[in-house]
């Protein structure tokens, strides 16, 4: 199990932990992400601070479930003929946590295929971080990335891919890691 932590804002006496667990069941592999409050053994938390931290963990878990359909993936395991193979990555930088899930086999909608799903969370609030928030001038950054796609990527696409899938550049499915930004 991988476990990463990030400090909450000054004044809070707790940390939010993000866990990633890979669980094998028969020939299936599930990746489960979960946020929770880190136990604070050094001091008794005040009620308002406890509530703030618990709310951040709850918000993060709602974002995780909404994005990754973890409960649906578990339900698929009992369906005859379903095959689920997942692998995940977890990365933190400052108060951001980035999760990536590669899902092969039976998808949440029941279709067979492969998908890559990313989610970046603010560990102080548990909220999803929109891609535009990572840039001082999001419009200029997106335009520069779309120029790279137009100039360098489109000519390399195989025939089965649609150009429309890349431009305009999707901004709702991305992840960050030590290499930088990946848009899916």
What are these regions (language model features)?
Residues 1-14:
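Sec-dependent N-terminal signal peptides of Gram-positive bacterial secreted proteins and lipoproteins
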């Amino acid at each position: 199990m991988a476990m990463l932590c990030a400090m909450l804002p000054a004044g809070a006496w707790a940390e939010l932990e993000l866990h990633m667990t890979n669980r094998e069941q028969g020939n299936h592999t599930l990746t489960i992400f979960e946020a929770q409050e880190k136990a604070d053994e050094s001091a008794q938390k005040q009620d308002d601070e406890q509530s703030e931290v618990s709310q951040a963990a709850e918000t993060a878990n709602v974002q995780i479930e909404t994005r990754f359909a973890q409960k649906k993936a578990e339900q698929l395991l009992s369906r005859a003929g379903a095959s689920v193979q997942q692998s995940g990555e977890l990365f933190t930088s400052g108060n951001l946590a980035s999760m990536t899930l590669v899902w092969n086999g039976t998808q949440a909608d029941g279709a067979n295929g492969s998908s890559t799903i990313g989610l970046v969370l603010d560990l102080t609030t548990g909220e999803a971080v929109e891609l535009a928030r990572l840039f001082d001038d999001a419009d200029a950054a997106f335009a520069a990335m779309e120029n790279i796609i137009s100039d360098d990527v489109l000519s390399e696409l195989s025939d089965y891919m649609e150009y429309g899938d890349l431009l305009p550049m999707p901004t709702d499915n991305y992840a960050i890691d030590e290499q930088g930004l990946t848009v899916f």
